[in-house]
Amino acid sequence: MLQTLYDYFWWERLWLPVNLTWADLEDRDGRVYAKASDLYITLPLALLFLIVRYFFELYVATPLAALLNIKEKTRLRAPPNATLEHFYLTSGKQPKQVEVELLSRQSGLSGRQVERWFRRRRNQDRPSLLKKFREASWRFTFYLIAFIAGMAVIVDKPWFYDMKKVWEGYPIQSTIPSQYWYYMIELSFYWSLLFSIASDVKRKDFKEQIIHHVATIILISFSWFANYIRAGTLIMALHDSSDYLLESAKMFNYAGWKNTCNNIFIVFAIVFIITRLVILPFWILHCTLVYPLELYPAFFGYYFFNSMMGVLQLLHIFWAYLILRMAHKFITGKLVEDERSDREETESSEGEEAAAGGGAKSRPLANGHPILNNNHRKND
């Protein structure tokens, strides 16, 4: 049974054009071709990424945060209460007024005390500014290096300037070491993002991020073993071109450098719109949808690849909407936080401000900077 499923999954008619077989992609005459087995290395590399990330955040990002005066914020903790904790974990983090009254009777606390407990308990689960900075620093470092490396891989290739050459000789296109490592490192990184997503800072578009990571992993994997490598390198470099800008904007935001953050965000928004909503659909997608049909009839792999590209494009439209809405509020002076941010709540009952900070007024954010409290995506 398993052998039958295995044979069907790797049936040439699913992944390759008509009249071609996997035998056509076997190494010969010094020419090396992509193989599905090459991807096995990405899982241990993903674990290595997690280890490198841990030490990077500990020995690079944390000292950098200290230089920028980004510190852990002391938070008032919710006192132990089994009744309220059980409701928090099983029924919801924001009880309705009727539920507050019921919990008040069950716990022996006043309604104000119940509301205060849930407010503090929610704040306990929210990531600290330092955690956000360390995560943004790690992603900024990777995306910047990946973008530079990706451009080095493709800038001297003829298909970078003439996309019809992406399909010249397809699928009998050999690979070179730079393409191999570019693919393995990118795929390993996205595996590491998927592995760490449960412990990373959670955004309001958490589900969209999971969809993005899964679709990206599927696309990179398929484009490798089906030898869509030329198109794949273009797509990966295109995506990396804006991601490092976003992460750097977040880093400056967490450091309280509002003007720098805002200026970088504007550049990021422009680059994102141009690359994701113009170049990707009208050049890259046109290249993968139209040009292959000039060489061979459509097959399952053709539809599968472009369907995954369609999923990514829908996510890009969704994130572009959030970016444009933020940009509009920024221009009109109404932007107070990122569209995806999970804003920390302030204490509002008498005496709590004094207990928390010597009677200071409630502040919506640590370090007092309201722009882009949290990060945009993608994804991202």
From Swiss-Prot:
GO terms for biological process: ceramide biosynthetic process; negative regulation of axon regeneration; negative regulation of Schwann cell migration; negative regulation of Schwann cell proliferation involved in axon regeneration; regulation of lipid metabolic process; response to immobilization stress; sphingolipid biosynthetic process. Ceramide synthase activity is inhibited by sphingosine-1-phosphate. It comes from Homo sapiens. Residues 344-353 have a biased composition (Acidic residues). It is found in: Endoplasmic reticulum membrane. The modification Phosphoserine is found at S341, S348, S349. Keywords: Acetylation, Endoplasmic reticulum, Glycoprotein, Lipid biosynthesis, Lipid metabolism, Membrane, Phosphoprotein, Transferase, Transmembrane, Transmembrane helix. Acetylated. Deacetylation by SIRT3 increases enzyme activity and promotes mitochondrial ceramide accumulation. Residues 67-128 are annotated as: Homeobox-like. The lineage of its organism: Eukaryota, Metazoa, Chordata, Craniata, Vertebrata. Pfam families: Homeodomain, TRAM_LAG1_CLN8. PANTHER family: CERAMIDE SYNTHASE 2 (PTHR12560:SF7), LONGEVITY ASSURANCE FACTOR 1 LAG1 (PTHR12560). Expressed in kidney, liver, brain, heart, placenta and lung. This is Ceramide synthase 2. Residues 325-380 are cytoplasmic. Glycans are attached at N19. Its EC number is 2.3.1.24, 2.3.1.297. Interacts with ATP6V0C, ASGR1, ASGR2 and SLC22A1/OCT1. Interacts with ELOV1, HSD17B12 and TECR. Interacts with NDUFS2. Interacts with PAQR4; the interaction regulates the stability and activity of CERS2 and is inhibited in presence of ceramides. Residues 1-40 are lumenal. The modification Phosphothreonine is found at T346. InterPro entries: HD, Homeodomain-like_sf, Lag1/Lac1-like, TLC-dom. One of its GO terms (cellular component) is membrane. Residues 131-332 form the TLC domain. Ceramide synthase that catalyzes the transfer of the acyl chain from acyl-CoA to a sphingoid base, with high selectivity toward very-long-chain fatty acyl-CoA (chain length C22-C27). N-acylates sphinganine and sphingosine bases to form dihydroceramides and ceramides in de novo synthesis and salvage pathways, respectively. Plays a non-redundant role in the synthesis of ceramides with very-long-chain fatty acids in kidney, liver and brain. Regulates the abundance of myelin-specific sphingolipids galactosylceramide and sulfatide that affects myelin sheath architecture and motor neuron functions. One of its GO terms (molecular function) is sphingosine N-acyltransferase activity. It is an enzyme of class 2 (transferase). Residues 338-380 are annotated as: Disordered.
